[in-house]
Curated annotation (Swiss-Prot):
Gene Ontology molecular function: any one: 2-C-methyl-D-erythritol 4-phosphate cytidylyltransferase activity
Cited function: Catalyzes the formation of 4-diphosphocytidyl-2-C-methyl-D-erythritol from CTP and 2-C-methyl-D-erythritol 4-phosphate (MEP).
Name of this protein: 2-C-methyl-D-erythritol 4-phosphate cytidylyltransferase
Family: Belongs to the IspD/TarI cytidylyltransferase family. IspD subfamily.
Gene from which the chain derives: ispD
Protein species of origin: Thiobacillus denitrificans (strain ATCC 25259 / T1)
EC number: 2.7.7.60
Amino acid sequence: MKFYALIPAAGSGSRMGGAIEKQYMDVNSVPMIAHAMMVLAREPRIARIFVVLSPTDKRWNNYEWQGWEERIEVLRCGGGTRAETVLNALDAIAEVCDPADWVLVHDAARPCLPDEMLGKLLDEVADDPVGGLLAVPVADTLKRAAGDTSSGTRVEATVPRAGLWQAQTPQMFRHGTLTEALRAAGSDMTDEASAIEKLGLQPQLVESDSRNLKVTYPQDLELASLILGKMNA
């Protein structure tokens, strides 16, 4: 049994509103995706890391990746959605990956994954029959917006937060099971665990923390920079 990692990086990050794709934006003078790659590369149990790019990506080759060759392989098979990108990558690595091998899917836009959280995920899920993901219990009070209002966005109801968790990545599932799940679920799945759930399976939740944030909006870049600065101090 081996562990492999996938970093889907074929999207544009439209909510960031930047001039370049989100995964290539600088965080502490390093492309965001490189931070995600580095933490995975530091984990010796991960046999190989596959970075999944759009076939039309023109920025990857603008950077110096010398020294990464033994750990990183680039796949230019990204699709129109995250689910399509991950499924295309799973198909591309099927010849080297046994159906029982573990695949960890990690967001390129999560540059602050702590080493110990990655290790915790591997330790707790390696013997699980389904797989699992990093996640954090929801702490804030949640409000559901009313669907039809003429006077601005209004609260329709408060959503009980008991039992609610915020999904993070990596999300870790066996190659065969994840391939089956994504093929059956279609292209609108926003994370891998959702596809696994549609098979009737229950992924394990492995508690993480707020350092492992996803950079989604411009203000998140400053926070990610501060977190990385403290982690690397």
